[in-house]
Regions:
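Conserved S-adenosyl-L-methionine
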Residues: 147-257, 262-264, 272-275, 282, ...
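Residues within alpha-helical segments
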Residues: 20, 36, 188, 223-224, ...
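Signature of N6-adenine DNA methyltransferases within the class I
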Residues: 1-2, 245-252, 262-418
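Non-catalytic, mostly N-terminal accessory regions of nucleic-acid modification and defense proteins
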Residues: 1-169, 234-243, 335-338, 360-375, ...
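A generic structural signal for residues located within well-ordered alpha-helices
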Residues: 30, 128, 153, 217, ...
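Surface-exposed acidic, glycine-flexible loop patches that form ligand/cofactor-binding
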Residues: 121, 200-202, 295, 400
C-alpha cells in the first residue's frame, strides 16, 4: 500500500510540476487539466490497441498520428483531432465535449505529450489510475487561482453523505449538478463491494449512475474521472445539459448533490418556461431542490447540500418548503460549518429526505456552532463527521437517541417534534440551540487564510459583475 501511495504521489507531482511551468506561461490550471485529459485518453486508447483490444478512435486521429510531430505541425494536428473527436456521439464525444486547445506553445504541448507518453496507463488498476486523476482534480479544486473550487465538494463530506444514505448495488444514483463526479464515484465505491455477481457489477458500471452538468469543461473532467475508474467505458453516464430545463421522465432511487448557489446566469432560458409546474423563483438552489424532488422515485432517498436561505426565506421559497414537508419525509438536517467550501463564508446544510410520506419529527445535527475549518490549514476530515454518522443510525432510524437534554443543552443531536416543526413561522427550519461563548482561538495563519479565501471570492464576484456590465452602456 505504501508503494502504491508513493507511486501515486510521484505521478501527481509530475503532473503538477508541468502545471506550474505552464502557469508561468499563462496557461491556467484548469485549462491544463482539460488538455491533460484529452491527451491521456488518446494515450490509453493507443495502449488498448497495442494489446489487441481495438481502438475507439478513427484512423488519422490517434496518438500515433500526433506524438511524433513538433512545432506548428503538432499544434495543427492536435487541434484537428480535438475538433473531429468532439463530433462523436458516444463516450469519446462526451469526453471531448466542445474540445479546443488551450496550450498554444508547441514546446509546452510537447512536454505534456512526453509526460503522458512516459507512463503505461491502460493496464493500471482502475482504483490506482482513478486515484491519480482524483488527486489531480482535488488539488486543482483546492487551488484558489484555478477557480475550480466552485465545482468541488470536500471528499470527507461526500463520503459521510454516501455512508448514511447507503446506496445499494441494484439502485440507481443521480447527481443533477455533478461537477467532477465526486458523489457518483463515492457511491460507486460504496456499492461495488456489496456483490460479486457479474450481472450486478455490469449494471453498476454501465446503468446505475447518472450525472449532468451544463459546463462542457466539467463534463469532460467528470466523464474522464469515471472512465479511469472503469465506469461507463462504453457510454459515459455524464451528460452535458441544463438540469433545470430537463423534462425527461427518468427517475432515480438515490439523489446526491451539491447544486450551484445564487441566481441563474444572465441570458439563461427561464426555468418556468420549461418547468411550469415549478413554484417560480430565480434562486438556483431552490430550483434545483424542486428538480430533485421531481426525479426521485417513491421510497427514494435524497441528500443535498443547500444554503441557509432555503431554510429561512419567505415567499416562493417558503412554498417550496411547504411542498417538501408535505410530500417528503425530511427527517434529518446536518448544519455545516463555514470554511469548507470555495466560497468561504457561505453557510450550508445537508438535507436528508425520502419520498412518500409527510415530514413529522426532524432530527438536527449541529456541526456548525463552535466548529472551525478552512480549506487549507484545517480541512474537514471524514473522522470529523463520525459523530454525525453514528447518531444518524443509517438503516435503523428508529434507534436514534438525542445527545441534547436539559442536563446537556449543548448536545449536538436534537429531535424537533412534529408540533415544533409545524408551529414555526413560514415553516422556517433554521434550528439553533447551542450557546457556546468561546474565545476565538484561530491562529494568525488561519485568519490570513480565511481572509485570502474571502478576498478571492470577492475578486471572482467583481470579475463576474464586470463581465455582465461590460456589454451595458452605462
Amino acid at each position: 500500500m505504501a508503494d502504491i501511495q508513493k507511486s501515486e504521489a510521484t505521478l501527481v507531482k509530475k503532473v503538477w510540476d508541468i502545471a506550474n511551468v505552464l502557469a508561468a506561461a499563462g496557461v491556467g490550471f484548469t485549462d491544463y487539466i482539460t488538455q491533460l485529459t484529452y491527451i491521456l485518453f488518446l494515450k490509453m486508447d493507443a495502449e488498448k490497441e497495442e494489446l489487441g483490444l481495438g481502438s475507439s478512435i478513427p484512423d488519422g486521429y490517434k496518438w500515433k498520428d500526433i506524438v511524433e510531430l513538433n512545432g506548428d505541425d503538432l499544434i495543427d494536428k492536435y487541434e484537428e483531432v480535438l475538433k473531429e473527436l468532439s463530433k462523436d456521439d458516444g463516450l469519446i464525444g462526451t469526453i471531448f465535449t466542445k474540445a479546443s486547445n488551450k496550450i498554444n506553445s508547441p514546446v509546452h504541448l510537447a512536454k505534456v505529450f512526453q509526460m503522458v507518453g512516459n507512463e503505461n496507463w491502460y493496464m493500471m488498476e482502475g482504483d490506482f489510475k482513478g486515484a491519480i486523476y482524483e488527486s489531480i482534480l482535488e488539488k486543482n479544486g483546492q487551488d484558489k487561482k484555478s477557480g475550480a473550487g466552485q465545482y468541488f465538494t470536500p471528499r470527507a463530506l461526500i463520503k459521510a453523505m454516501v455512508d448514511v444514505i447507503d446506496p445499494k448495488i441494484t439502485e440507481t444514483v443521480a447527481d443533477p449538478a455533478c461537477g467532477t463526479g465526486g458523489f457518483l464515484l463515492a457511491a460507486f465505491d460504496h456499492m461495488k463491494p456489496q456483490s460479486k455477481d457479474l450481472s450486478k457489477q455490469n449494471f453498476l458500471k454501465n446503468n446505475a449512475l447518472f450525472g449532468a452538468d451544463n459546463t462542457a469543461l466539467v463534463v469532460t473532467l467528470a466523464s474522464m474521472n469515471l472512465y479511469l475508474h472503469d465506469i461507463g467505458t462504453e457510454k459515459s453516464p455524464i451528460v452535458c445539459q441544463d438540469s433545470l430545463l430537463d423534462t425527461s421522465d427518468r427517475m432515480f432511487d438515490v439523489i446526491l448533490a451539491n447544486p450551484p448557489f445564487g441566481t441563474r446566469p444572465q441570458g439563461s432560458v427561464a426555468v418556468d418556461s420549461a418547468r411550469p409546474e415549478f413554484i417560480k423563483t430565480s434562486d438556483n438552489q431552490v430550483n434545483f431542490l424542486q428538480h430533485i424532488m421531481s426525479i426521485v422515485k417513491t421510497g427514494g432517498r435524497v441528500a443535498v447540500v443547500l444554503p441557509d436561505n432555503v431554510l429561512t426565506d419567505g415567499n416562493a421559497t417558503a412554498k417550496v418548503r411547504e411542498k417538501l414537508l408535505a410530500d417528503f419525509n425530511l427527517h434529518t438536517i446536518l448544519r455545516l460549518p463555514t470554511g469548507i467550501f470555495y466560497a468561504g463564508g457561505v453557510k450550508t446544510n445537508v438535507l436528508f429526505f425520502e419520498k412518500g410520506e409527510k415530514t413529522r419529527d426532524i432530527w438536527v445535527y449541529d456541526y456548525r456552532t463552535g466548529i472551525k475549518h478552512t480549506m487549507v490549514t484545517k480541512p474537514m476530515t471524514r473522522a470529523d463527521l463520525d459523530g454525525f454518522v453514528n447518531c444518524y443510525c443509517s438503516g435503523h432510524l428508529e434507534d436514534r437517541k438525542e445527545t441534547y437534554s436539559e442536563e446537556n443543552p449543548n448536545g449536538r443531536w436534537r429531535k424537533f417534534s412534529e408540533e415544533e416543526v409545524y408551529s414555526r413561522d413560514q415553516l422556517k427550519l433554521d434550528f439553533k440551540w447551542i450557546d457556546l461563548t468561546e474565545k476565538d482561538d484561530r491562529t494568525i495563519t488561519e485568519l490570513l487564510s480565511e481572509m485570502q479565501e474571502k478576498a478571492t471570492a470577492i475578486g471572482d464576484a467583481v470579475s463576474k459583475l464586470q463581465e455582465i456590465l461590460g456589454g451595458i452602456d452605462l
